[in-house]
A protein has these predicted regions:
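Basic, polyanion-binding surface patches
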Residues: 1-167
Length: 167
């Protein structure tokens, strides 16, 4: 296979930018910027997310069978970069960001446009990112979204011409 062609083709798949959060209930909190996310069913509402297997977030999600996806808006580029590295939970803030706990215990970013709390229904363990299937159990949209909701979301292409993930 031509490696350059593979990279170019796979980078044509559009990605939103999200922050996945999880809490182990014992003081362990993790957050990670993720972009391999999609809805896969209406009833029950299911989402899938690719989570890097050697991340702290993956360990907590696998053990607790729950997570929250925080949707970032176009103005949240800085948040995306904040959670590219391991998160710190100090003084009730997650890497300096205001949060509150959802019903599943995972942090919800106060700045997020929306968040969905999920219970894990299955994990496909293949590759360097495992596919986590989550049933949406709660949804939060703290403020009305003007226009199409999908136009409000931060996308990989919004992070600049030199920021890629995948390929």
């Amino acid at each position: 296979m031509n490696a350059d062609a593979k990279k170019a083709a796979l980078r044509m798949i559009p990605y939103g930018i999200y922050v996945l959060t999880a809490d182990d209930g014992k003081g362990g909190v993790a957050a990670a910027t993720v972009n391999w996310v999609t809805q896969t069913a209406f009833a029950p509402p299911l989402v899938v997310v690719g989570v890097k297997t050697d991340s702290g977030a993956y360990g907590i999600v696998k053990s607790t069978k729950s997570f929250t996806l925080n949707m970032l808006g176009k103005a949240h580029k800085g948040l995306a970069f904040t959670f590219f590295k391991p998160a710190q939970f100090e003084g009730g803030k997650l890497s300096g960001q205001a949060v509150h706990k959802g019903t599943n215990g995972a942090p919800i970013l106060e700045a997020a446009l929306a968040a969905v709390e999920c219970k894990v229904t299955s994990i496909v363990e293949q590759g360097d990112h495992h596919i986590v299937v989550g049933e949406v159990t709660e949804a939060h949209v703290p403020n009305p979204i003007s226009g199409r909701p999908d136009n409000a979301i931060l996308e990989m292409k919004d992070l600049g011409d030199n920021v890629f993930y995948g390929g």
